[in-house]
From Swiss-Prot:
InterPro entries linked to this entry: Histone-fold, Histone_H2A/H2B/H3, Histone_H3/CENP-A
Protein name: Histone H3.3a
Sequence positions bearing N6-methylated lysine: K5, K10, K19, K24, K28, K37
Subunit structure as annotated in this protein's UniProt entry: The nucleosome is a histone octamer containing two molecules each of H2A, H2B, H3 and H4 assembled in one H3-H4 heterotetramer and two H2A-H2B heterodimers. The octamer wraps approximately 147 bp of DNA.
Cross-referenced Pfam families: Histone (PF00125)
Expressed in which tissues: Pollen specific.
Gene label: MPH3
SMART domains: H3 (SM00428)
Residues recorded with modification N6-acetyllysine: K10, K15, K19, K24
Keywords: Acetylation, Chromosome, DNA-binding, Methylation, Nucleosome core, Nucleus, Phosphoprotein
Length: 136
């Protein structure tokens, strides 16, 4: 289609241009110094969903080994002093603990969804444990 020259037309009503606020006008007239770019941010929930997919794919342990080992030793001291642990024993305990927690959080999430919520709460954990028969 061939280009045609635009001719000025008389306005027939419509909205009158609004006056700019003083701050908006000052912002437009002031030159930008340095051109600092705002860092990119994902929408709320996007990173959480990405992390969920990442951790569901992986099979490695999520709790750090040394803090878990310290916790095991601290709990064991309540029962008997000077206990020694093989490294494989601590790893087996960690595998079992993480498997238990993952299962508990899955059930907790189902309890939250049943209550028409997406956020898990302590009452969901309590309900999941009660249904499992772990806590009366």
């Amino acid at each position: 289609m061939a280009r045609t020259k635009q001719t000025a037309r008389k306005s027939t009503g419509g909205k009158a241009p609004r006056k700019q606020l003083a701050t908006k006008a000052a912002r437009k007239s002031a030159p930008t110094t340095g051109g600092v770019k705002k860092p990119h941010r994902y929408r709320p929930g996007t990173v959480a969903l990405r992390e969920i997919r990442k951790y569901q794919k992986s099979t490695d342990l999520l709790i750090r080994k040394l803090p878990f080992q310290r916790l095991v030793r601290e709990i064991a001291q309540d029962y008997k002093a000077d206990l020694r642990f093989q490294s494989h024993a601590v790893l087996a305990l960690q595998e079992a603990a993480e498997a238990y927690l993952v299962g508990l959080f899955e059930d907790t999430n189902l309890c939250a969804i049943h209550a028409k919520r997406v956020t898990i709460m302590p009452k969901d954990i309590q309900l999941a444990r009660r249904i499992r028969g772990e806590r009366a």
